[in-house]
Regions:
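A detector for short metal-coordination/catalytic motifs
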Residues: 67, 78-119
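Histidine-centered nuclease catalytic patch
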Residues: 39-74, 80-92
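Short, charged surface segments at domain edges that flank catalytic/cofactor-binding sites
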Residues: 2-39, 98-107, 111-114
Length: 119
């Protein structure tokens, strides 16, 4: 019983954090992010449904915005949880440098495209 109540409290806390944060990611932006990454941002798989993953977790002050969201496969998203991304990549023995280089390039492209888009 205690486990369920802890899970319920954690879910309520997460719901409050998400509701309190400024989350301005639109469906069109999410589609553009998925197209730019062409698969999981972490492991590169292109199979399955991609989930929205915050590079900086919501619990650490992250938000659902163009510059913080990447597509992640289910296993990577569940494994990363709310860990710091570079430490998690090292532990999983994934290519940290490749991720960071792609993240910076794709993020800049998406932000530039959004700057030119009408509001």
């Amino acid at each position: 019983m205690a486990v369920n109540s802890r899970r319920a409290r954690a879910a309520r806390r997460r719901k409050r954090r998400v509701a309190a944060a400024v989350n301005d990611l639109t469906d069109a932006q999410w589609t553009a992010i998925k197209a730019a990454w062409n698969g999981c941002a972490y492991c590169g798989t292109t199979t399955g449904t991609m989930q929205r993953d915050c590079v900086m977790a919501i619990s650490r002050g992250g938000r659902y915005t163009v510059d913080n969201v990447v597509p992640a496969c289910g296993p990577c998203n569940a494994s990363k949880c709310n860990d710091e991304v570079t430490g998690w990549l090292r532990r999983k023995r994934l290519d940290e440098r490749l991720f960071l280089e792609r993240y910076v390039r794709i993020r800049a492209e998406l932000l530039a495209a959004n700057a030119g888009a009408p509001s």
